[in-house]
Amino acid sequence: MTLWCTVLGALLTVVGCLCLSLLLRHRRPWEPPLDKGFVPWLGHSMAFRKNMFEFLKGMRAKHGDVFTVQLGGQYFTFVMDPLSFGPIIKNTEKALDFQSYAKELVLKVFGYQSVDGDHRMIHLASTKHLMGQGLEELNQAMLDSLSLVMLGPKGSSLGASSWCEDGLFHFCYRILFKAGFLSLFGYTKDKQQDLDEADELFRKFRRFDFLFPRFVYSLLGPREWVEVSQLQRLFHQRLSVEQNLEKDGISCWLGYMLQFLREQGIASSMQDKFNFMMLWASQGNTGPTCFWVLLFLLKHQDAMKAVREEATRVMGKARLEAKKSFTFTPSALKHTPVLDSVMEESLRLCATPTLLRVVQEDYVLKMASGQEYQIRRGDKVALFPYLSVHMDPDIHPEPTAFKYDRFLNPDGTRKVDFYKSGKKIHHYSMPWGSGVSKCPGRFFALSEMKTFVLLMIMYFDFKLVDPDIPVPPIDPRRWGFGTSQPSHEVRFLYRLKPVQ
């Protein structure tokens, strides 16, 4: 009994010292401004989670371009000067680490235990199968899946041109998810069954997506924790390696990565969790992004006209083959500078990722101004490009306005020259992240979104139920989690054009 009391006392002493050191943390010389908030340990957590954008905007106004805040017992140093991003992103000294944070996150969210080399493996697989010839093959598979999802297994009657009504966000998310899921995970012999399965999986995916932000922050209620666990198990089962064996057409990209895991001796149950992670990574942002793209086009008829003219010039006349397949040449995606600018501008306005690095050893942050700051080991360095880059009026004049030609030069080529304080800036748009955390699947994601938008432009008539409805604000719960989502749905009408 005496021994246990001694051990317990020692543990309490250690924990007490740790807590005391956190509570008594103060700013040292050469460190950034420190703002711990008024609530011990929690710090600014509640304000940050309530509206990350407004919180960081207020902190920048108070402290400047570099500041450290306490969030749930952890200290985050936010850097708001994009001219100073380079050393953080390149990180040649390896003092800043991305993978340790990423491994913790995927274990918590998807149940996947990362192994040595799998981050490099994902990038190798993406380079081989999501670029060049591999990308062209996957683009064709995505086109076939979009034809199946949008026209049905029996094809669409050319006379069926009556208007249908739906929520634009739901429509885009559902179509892109189902087509993406089928393109990556393959088909059975029963196409209608495949569509029904994808539809059911989409409903579960949306529920998980709804809970996701609070899940990451550990803010779920008891029943929601149970529900999340049930959803995780469902996806592990429905995306299992065993079930995939019954399907044809699994993507070479996914097959390559699963082969690597098998060669590493990874259990099939862990491969199932890897599949869930890949489904989320590939389908969590494309549908929401396309919602914003179509909404901006509907609200800006000059942009719609420019994209239509480009689509007609590049693609020719729209036709349906055997009434159930879109006639579309995926290679044409390389020749759409206007649509490329529309996509980049939409992503500038709707993509809100947070880039995090864990400080592995005491680190000197060197700013473009020449100022240097000491960052402590164990802290996190964070970038929030939506506020510091995308909404900077010096880089992007009228930053809150949608300008479809913002990323076009007068001669119609892509614009890449942007400036801040008179200096050319490299990081002028960061919807995909940057450095080691840059999305490896961005080329395929962009291709599938462009394909969907072009199909809607060429083959469908669509309009808003209320043409005067304003663009909805971003749901504040989604700040920092990839592509933002609207605070409310927008109703629209659509119908298949009478094509031959």
Swiss-Prot record:
This is 7-alpha-hydroxycholest-4-en-3-one 12-alpha-hydroxylase. One of its GO terms (biological process) is positive regulation of intestinal cholesterol absorption. It is an enzyme of class 1 (oxidoreductase). It comes from Mus musculus. The gene is Cyp8b1. Pathway: Lipid metabolism; bile acid biosynthesis. A cytochrome P450 monooxygenase involved in primary bile acid biosynthesis. Catalyzes the 12alpha-hydroxylation of 7alpha-hydroxy-4-cholesten-3-one, an intermediate metabolite in cholic acid biosynthesis. Controls biliary balance of cholic acid and chenodeoxycholic acid, ultimately regulating the intestinal absorption of dietary lipids. Mechanistically, uses molecular oxygen inserting one oxygen atom into a substrate, and reducing the second into a water molecule, with two electrons provided by NADPH via cytochrome P450 reductase (CPR; NADPH--hemoprotein reductase). Heme binds at residue 439. The keyword Metal-binding applies. Disulfide bonds: none annotated. Disruption phenotype: Knockout mice are resistant to Western diet-induced hepatic steatosis due to impaired cholic acid synthesis and deficient fat absorption. The modification Phosphoserine is found at residue 325. Its main location: endoplasmic reticulum. The lineage of its organism: Eukaryota, Metazoa, Chordata, Craniata, Vertebrata.
